[in-house]
Structures are given as structure tokens and as C-alpha cells.
Amino acid sequence: MAVAIAAARVWRPNRGLSQAALLLLWRPGARGLARSHPHRQQQQFSSLDDKPQFPGASAEFIDKLEFIQPNVISGIPIYRVMDRQGQIINPSEDPHLPKEKVLKLYKSMTLLNTMDRILYESQRQGRISFYMTNYGEEGTHVGSAAALDNTDLVFGQYREAGVLMYRDYPLELFMAQCYGNISDLGKGRQMPVHYGCKERHFVTISSPLATQIPQAVGAAYAAKRANANRVVICYFGEGAASEGDAHAGFNFAATLECPIIFFCRNNGYAISTPTSEQYRGDGIAARGPGYGIMSIRVDGNDVFAVYNATKEARRRAVAENQPFLIEAMTYRIGHHSTSDDSSAYRSVDEVNYWDKQDHPISRLRHYLLSQGWWDEEQEKAWRKQSRKKVMKAFEQAERKPKPNPNLLFSDVYQEMPAQLRKQQESLARHLQTYGEHYPLEHFDK
């Protein structure tokens, strides 16, 4: 409109134009055209005064053909608080957490590590059908969980068991879910590691990759409209960030100004695909500004860096109603799952480096030792105690029966429709006739 007005001010009416044509050219505010006179001196016009008015972007005109080159600047820096020996680098960034809270961080990570080892071996022995470990990524879980309010809603992917662990989710329920027994909150309907807990505001995990991202945005939008003073945090891996749902979620969150934290665990591999084959840009954090999202990249093996970033993101997300993106750089030490053999696509030396030289548990242990809050005797006692606790829950879960097969048909409708009741009756007749072919003794009566 401004360009049209400027042009109108220097335009001389052609005597051949009718009065009607002149009226069609005039618009409110274009006074120069309405008052123009053939003998009035033209105003000087400079292209420097021509400012972009396009509604889609805020920018300046340039007169040189130049494409934007990828990675022309150095990569987004990685924020950290502790070095690999657990020493605080910049005292002003020390969160100064009390001893009790730091010990809870450490015990949550080590308890998760112990549970992982036992359940991984139980799958290898055929006791459960599937499992996914969290080796190497424990710091991203508990560091972020500690910075949230307990009522903040969590949407996980499938490798965030530490968030529930920090929220005091009982070991018995972890085991019940993996075994699919009668104590499982999901009534045995989900495959292992698909946890969920309404009381702890942890939305049940679903297998399809990245579906939780737009769902989390919807929940955050609802929280905003309800003035709930809560944030939604959505976890995902860098592989899931390549899914279309990630784009939809990022864009909706930015345009609807939702109080959400997108937490990306960049662990180096999307199953067997390394990051070098996943994207050419500067990781995931670099995508945030393009959507209008505040973004940061942190050392995911530094639990304090994760804590600080999440705490500040939460504060601002609630206060300002805007999304934040945290990319936590870490490494998946374990196999993708019990269905994967990572030795086929990475070296043992590579894995050993991260396990021995830059493990989040080791880093926090160094910090505790330097503070005088932990010693080797306490370490041995806790490791023994944690294993005993996990084994007790493990043995209890193994002894409990599976849910009654009739529960397959419940919790779908408030009142069971005729078609579903017909299927239930059909299953009952089938089991009555051929029950000896099924391990019904393992199911609740």
C-alpha cells in the first residue's frame, strides 16, 4: 500500500482517463492522487525510502543476489555448569542446590541404572518381551524433572523413565508395566516401557514416533486458556524431530503462544542412523528461531546445566506464554532396544569413551565427593541397597498373574455396545473350548 501511495504522489493524470477511472484508482489515505495537479512539481522519490511491507517477514531489501549459506557461522554453543570432573566452571551459574536435592538427583539416576540392568537381563532371559535402557541419558531425565513443578504435565517418548523415577513412581509399578501383570495401571495392554501415571501427571507413552509433540502443544494451549499456571514438557529424540509432527507442533506452539518446553535428547543416533545422516543443519536447537521459539543447547551429561535451562524455560514459559526449545547433547550408551545390536553400526571404543569418560552419573558423583556429601562406603552401601530394592519389586511382579482376558473389552465405552459384547462372548466360548492350548493359569480368574 505504501508503495502504491508513493507512486500515486508522483503520477500525473492522463487527460484521457475518465472521472470514474480516477475514482477507482483512489483509495482512502492516497491524498496525493486525489489532489494531484498537472502543473504541481513532482516530489523526489528514492529507492532507499522503499521499505518492505510484506506481511510474512520482517526484513530489509537488498540489491545484491545472495543465497543464505548453511552453517556460515559457528555452531550454537553448548551451555554447561560442571566440567567432566564435577567442578563448577562459573560460580555464578552454580544452582546451589541443597544437599538433599543433589542426593535425590544422584540416587534417582543410579536407581534407574540398576533397574535398567536387571530388566535388560530379564528380557534376555525371556522373562519379559521387550526393553529399552536409559544408559548415558539419565542426566537429561532427572535434571529436567527436578526443575519442574510436580503438577506440570509430561509427554514422553520412550526413554524418559528417569522423570517418573524422580517423581517417586514406585519400582513395583515400573515392574508391573513391563510384566503386564494385574498391578499394571495400563492393565497389560501396552508393550513394556510404555509407562503412564495420571497421579504424577505423566501421559501414557505411545509407540508411534513424534505423535506426542502436537498432542503436548494442544495440552499446553488448553492450560493457557484455563490460566492453569502450569507448563507442559514434551520429550523427544533428534530422530523424532525429523518427523512431520515435529514441524506441526513447533509451528502451532509458536503461533498460539503456548507454555511448553520442547526437550530434545540428541543422543547421536536415531536407532542406527547417526546424526550425520539425519540432518545437514546445526542440530535441533538451530531450528527453533526459524519458528520463533526461544532455544538453547545444553550439555545433557551435566545435570546442573539441564536443571538451570529447564528451570528458566519453565519460569518464562508460564510468565510469558511462549514455547522454549532445549536441545540436550548426550550419548546413548546402550543399544536402541533389546531388538537392536548397536555393534553393527558403531565401535566398542566409541561406546566405551562415553561410558568411561563422560557419563552423567560419574560427573555428579565427582561433584558429591568434592563437596564431602558422599564417599566410597556410602556408594557401596547404596548400590547394594538399590539392587535389593529392584530385585524385590522384580520378584513380586513375576509372581503376580496377568489381567483377566475380559479386561480386553473394558475401558473403551462407558456402556459396552452390542457388537463389543458379542466379541467378548465369542472369546469366552473360544477359551472354554480350546482353553488347554493357552497358559490361562497365568491369568487372573
From Swiss-Prot:
Source domain of life is Eukaryota
Residues bound to thiamine diphosphate: Y158, R159, S207, G239, A240, R265, H336
What's the chief localization of this chain? mitochondrion
Identify the enzyme class. Answer: oxidoreductase
For the modification Phosphoserine, the affected residues are: S337, S339, S347
- Residues where Phosphothreonine is found: T338
Q: Name one Pfam family in it.
A: E1_dh
Provide this UniProt record's keywords sorted from A to Z.
Answer: Acetylation, Magnesium, Metal-binding, Mitochondrion, Oxidoreductase, Phosphoprotein, Potassium, Thiamine pyrophosphate, Transit peptide
Q: Which residues carry this modification: N6-succinyllysine?
A: K356, K380
- Alphabetized InterPro entries for the sequence: Alpha-ketoacid_DH_E1_comp, DH_E1, THDP-binding
**Family, per the entry?**
Belongs to the BCKDHA family.
Q: How does it assemble?
A: Heterotetramer of 2 alpha/BCKDHA and 2 beta chains/BCKDHB that forms the branched-chain alpha-keto acid decarboxylase (E1) component of the BCKD complex. The branched-chain alpha-ketoacid dehydrogenase is a large complex composed of three major building blocks E1, E2 and E3. It is organized around E2, a 24-meric cubic core composed of DBT, to which are associated 6 to 12 copies of E1, and approximately 6 copies of the dehydrogenase E3, a DLD dimer. Interacts with PPM1K.
This protein's name: 2-oxoisovalerate dehydrogenase subunit alpha, mitochondrial
Organism in which the protein naturally occurs: Macaca fascicularis
The gene for this chain is BCKDHA
